Amino acid sequence: MNLSVIIPVYNEVESIKVILGRVQDTKLAKEIIVVDDASTDGTREVLRKLDGKRGIHVLLHPRNKGKGAAVRTGLAAAKGDILLIQDADLEYDPRDIPELLKPIQEGLADVVYGSRFLGRAHRVTMFWHMVANRMLTFMTNILYNTILTDMETGYKVFRRDVIGNMVIRANSFDFEPEFTAKILKRNYRIFEVAITFNPRDYTQGKKIKLYDAFEAVWALIKYRFVE
């Protein structure tokens, strides 16, 4: 198994070294691809110093394009046969990576989602943010006849061939619904694994806004009927 961990980053100077250290400590990643989406807080300077060390490969966007664009850049550069998307903000704990990989390693799944709603320990989160996540997941289940608990999770793991002929167009937070819609329409085997979760609030730099929820709704509807 060759695991590529893809980390999209935007203005995470306080957490980037910590998250990279935690991923490295798992000793599972053959490469760690960090895509900086034109950070302005010193993150880029930190990453330049880390580039090439202990499997870290840094890619720099010349201008801010959005999380989805950063993920797509990372996917295009990844060489592993299993790909894992890891947020840089410490909400998702890399110590969960071994459990996320198991269903794929055991031949039970093509795609694994780390679910924040399956009962593992988590910090109390903002009510309306939780409601929005639940509603988007419920909408996904209705449109695509599935029983996911957490469509919007930032932890997604999948075999490389899953995206072999898949065109992802999302540039922003609509990556999650677009990717989910397309794997469901292709009937890939999806497992969900319970993860720990330590959510940030807007004062701590959480970047998801109301507009992103509307964009996600549109993506779910659109990709139900096209591609």
Residue ranges and their predicted role:
Residues L3-E12, I19, T26, V35:
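A conserved hydrophobic helix/loop-capping motif in glycosyltransferases and polysaccharide synthases
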Residues H61-A77, I82, P94-F173, N198-W218, ...:
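Acceptor/aglycone-binding surface of glycosyltransferases and processive sugar-polymer synthases
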Residues E14-V18, D41-L50:
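Acidic helix N-cap motif at the loop->helix transition within catalytic regions
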Residues L20-Q24, A29-S39, L59-H61:
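Short beta-strand/loop segment that forms part of the nucleotide-sugar
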